[in-house]
Amino acid sequence: MKLLYGTGNPAKLDAMRHRLAGLGIELIGLKDLGGVKQPEIIEDGKTPLENARKKAEAYFNARHMPVCSGDSGLYFDNVAEDDQPGVHVRTVNGKYLSDEEMTAHYAALAEKYGGLTGRYKNAVSLILDADHRYDAMDPSMESAPFRMVSTPHPMSKNGFPLDR
């Protein structure tokens, strides 16, 4: 089965291809569609699931093929609501952050709170056809808790600057 993974992030596409290896699924990304114009999607949901659904529906309606989209939110323990990234992990005060800007922002946040314990809450939305839609977001899909400190590790993965 050919399945469109609704992301423009090559690191996320590679990670999902690895997870699906051996299942008989040909996972393609948005860039694999060539120069076809993609719908503009404003990820303004309040939860990862709302954003995952929004992306899956937009890509399904535009491409008329099976689509899987995901979204994540980053949540820290004992951090003020104003400082919680939630679904806006890469966007701070309306600005989309580069990998380097993300590293600096979260290092400063860790400094402010004396270190952070966080986790990613993840959601997926799968649309096979008009009659078969599946959504999931529950605690079993969350990342393991992790610790973030103000001094970044020198090694990082392109596209995943906080995963060091």
What is each of the regions a protein language model found here?
Residues 2-4, 10-164:
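Anionic-ligand binding patches
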